[in-house]
């Protein structure tokens, strides 16, 4: 996918007036995970989260690795239980398949994608003191909150736990 940005007619044009964000170079290797959890392909993360080439490969890789490490930590006890039950990989744990993929693997990748993207968005917020900038920051904050929620829900789904716990005081 290539993104082409063409300025509005009334906007001042400098140089050629067109900015082209090129396609990914295709040289982003898959990130190897621990023995139990699936490897993560940065290209799939870019596609799922619509990041295109607006994020440098090194930054995306760091965010994904952080997302993998944190998700793995969240699922440590779950992993130990499944290993004790005789499963060597998350993909081997009994679960429904959707589109040929274990739903547990799908939710794992969703958790990593959401966490990596939330982390990137938190660090890429623009600085704009105008009212328009405040509105954009509020929108980004809302998106970040939704991504963190998606991560928590995906982890809960892997563990077979409810997405939220409500108690009466």
Curated annotation (Swiss-Prot):
Stored InterPro entries: Phage_head_completion_GpL
Domain of life: Viruses
Pfam families in the cross-refs: Phage_GPL (PF05926)
One Gene Ontology term from the biological process aspect of the record: viral capsid assembly
Family: To phage HP1 protein ORF20.
Task of the protein: Carries out the completion of filled heads by rendering the newly packaged DNA in filled heads resistant to DNase. The protein is assumed to bind to DNA-filled capsids.
Protein name as catalogued: Head completion/stabilization protein
Organism per entry: Escherichia phage P2
Lineage: Viruses, Duplodnaviria, Heunggongvirae, Uroviricota, Caudoviricetes
């Amino acid at each position: 996918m290539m993104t082409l940005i063409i300025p509005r007619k009334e906007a001042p044009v400098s140089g050629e007036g067109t900015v082209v964000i090129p396609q990914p170079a295709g040289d982003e290797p898959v990130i190897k995970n621990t023995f139990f959890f699936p490897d993560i392909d940065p290209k799939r993360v870019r596609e799922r989260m619509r990041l295109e080439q607006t994020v440098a490969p090194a930054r995306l890789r760091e965010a994904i690795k952080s997302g993998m490490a944190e998700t793995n930590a969240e699922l440590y006890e779950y992993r130990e239980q499944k290993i004790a039950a005789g499963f060597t990989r998350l993909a081997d744990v009994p679960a429904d398949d959707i589109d040929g993929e274990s739903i547990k693997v799908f939710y794992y990748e969703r958790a990593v994608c959401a966490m990596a993207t939330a982390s990137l968005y938190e660090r890429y917020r623009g600085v704009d003191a105008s009212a328009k900038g405040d509105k954009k920051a509020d929108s980004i904050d809302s998106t970040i909150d939704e991504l963190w929620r998606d991560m928590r829900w995906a982890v809960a789904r892997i563990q077979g736990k409810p997405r939220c716990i409500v108690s009466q005081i």
